[in-house]
């Protein structure tokens, strides 16, 4: 009877833990070079660990599959003037999209702090474009 009870408790614990364990894949190593624009960015997932994966990696065909930004069919148009959802530059720099761009999130993070704003959103000498 005790074995059956313990087996049931263990099975329940595993069933409850599985969604949490499968929720997000392991983030890639730091030093991810995003070089699709004139001024490359070295992106570190560890710096952004407080941000949920889905805040940047939006659903594609109803699924969160955490692809790279410039994956074919996503933000794969490298024309800086392309302001559509396909535009890579636009996806990183737009301030008013449903899914926050890098710049949109950094502006929100900086708030009214002018020095922080320059540090997080400046084109030259920022933490992004060094």
Curated annotation (Swiss-Prot):
<keyword id="KW-0479">Metal-binding</keyword>
<feature type="binding site" description="covalent">
    <location>
        <position position="123"/>
    </location>
    <ligand>
        <name>heme c 4</name>
    </ligand>
</feature>
<keyword id="KW-0574">Periplasm</keyword>
<feature type="binding site" description="axial binding residue">
    <location>
        <position position="57"/>
    </location>
    <ligand>
        <name>heme c 1</name>
    </ligand>
</feature>
<dbReference type="GO" id="GO:0046872">
    <property type="term" value="F:metal ion binding"/>
</dbReference>
<feature type="binding site" description="axial binding residue">
    <location>
        <position position="58"/>
    </location>
    <ligand>
        <name>heme c 2</name>
    </ligand>
</feature>
<feature type="binding site" description="axial binding residue">
    <location>
        <position position="106"/>
    </location>
    <ligand>
        <name>heme c 3</name>
    </ligand>
</feature>
<dbReference type="Pfam" id="PF02085">
    <property type="entry name" value="Cytochrom_CIII"/>
</dbReference>
<dbReference type="GO" id="GO:0042597">
    <property type="term" value="C:periplasmic space"/>
</dbReference>
<dbReference type="GO" id="GO:0020037">
    <property type="term" value="F:heme binding"/>
</dbReference>
<keyword id="KW-0349">Heme</keyword>
<keyword id="KW-0813">Transport</keyword>
<keyword id="KW-0763">Sulfate respiration</keyword>
<keyword id="KW-0732">Signal</keyword>
<keyword id="KW-0408">Iron</keyword>
<feature type="binding site" description="covalent">
    <location>
        <position position="53"/>
    </location>
    <ligand>
        <name>heme c 1</name>
    </ligand>
</feature>
<dbReference type="GO" id="GO:0009055">
    <property type="term" value="F:electron transfer activity"/>
</dbReference>
<comment type="function">
    <text>Participates in sulfate respiration coupled with phosphorylation by transferring electrons from the enzyme dehydrogenase to ferredoxin.</text>
</comment>
<feature type="binding site" description="axial binding residue">
    <location>
        <position position="93"/>
    </location>
    <ligand>
        <name>heme c 4</name>
    </ligand>
</feature>
<feature type="binding site" description="covalent">
    <location>
        <position position="69"/>
    </location>
    <ligand>
        <name>heme c 2</name>
    </ligand>
</feature>
<feature type="binding site" description="axial binding residue">
    <location>
        <position position="45"/>
    </location>
    <ligand>
        <name>heme c 1</name>
    </ligand>
</feature>
<feature type="binding site" description="axial binding residue">
    <location>
        <position position="48"/>
    </location>
    <ligand>
        <name>heme c 3</name>
    </ligand>
</feature>
<dbReference type="InterPro" id="IPR020942">
    <property type="entry name" value="Cyt_c_III_dom"/>
</dbReference>
<dbReference type="InterPro" id="IPR036280">
    <property type="entry name" value="Multihaem_cyt_sf"/>
</dbReference>
<feature type="binding site" description="covalent">
    <location>
        <position position="74"/>
    </location>
    <ligand>
        <name>heme c 2</name>
    </ligand>
</feature>
<feature type="binding site" description="axial binding residue">
    <location>
        <position position="129"/>
    </location>
    <ligand>
        <name>heme c 4</name>
    </ligand>
</feature>
<protein>
    <recommendedName>
        <fullName>Cytochrome c3</fullName>
    </recommendedName>
</protein>
<feature type="binding site" description="covalent">
    <location>
        <position position="105"/>
    </location>
    <ligand>
        <name>heme c 3</name>
    </ligand>
</feature>
<feature type="binding site" description="axial binding residue">
    <location>
        <position position="75"/>
    </location>
    <ligand>
        <name>heme c 2</name>
    </ligand>
</feature>
<feature type="signal peptide">
    <location>
        <begin position="1"/>
        <end position="23"/>
    </location>
</feature>
<dbReference type="InterPro" id="IPR002322">
    <property type="entry name" value="Cyt_c_III"/>
</dbReference>
<feature type="binding site" description="covalent">
    <location>
        <position position="56"/>
    </location>
    <ligand>
        <name>heme c 1</name>
    </ligand>
</feature>
<keyword id="KW-0249">Electron transport</keyword>
<feature type="binding site" description="covalent">
    <location>
        <position position="128"/>
    </location>
    <ligand>
        <name>heme c 4</name>
    </ligand>
</feature>
<dbReference type="GO" id="GO:0009061">
    <property type="term" value="P:anaerobic respiration"/>
</dbReference>
<feature type="binding site" description="covalent">
    <location>
        <position position="102"/>
    </location>
    <ligand>
        <name>heme c 3</name>
    </ligand>
</feature>
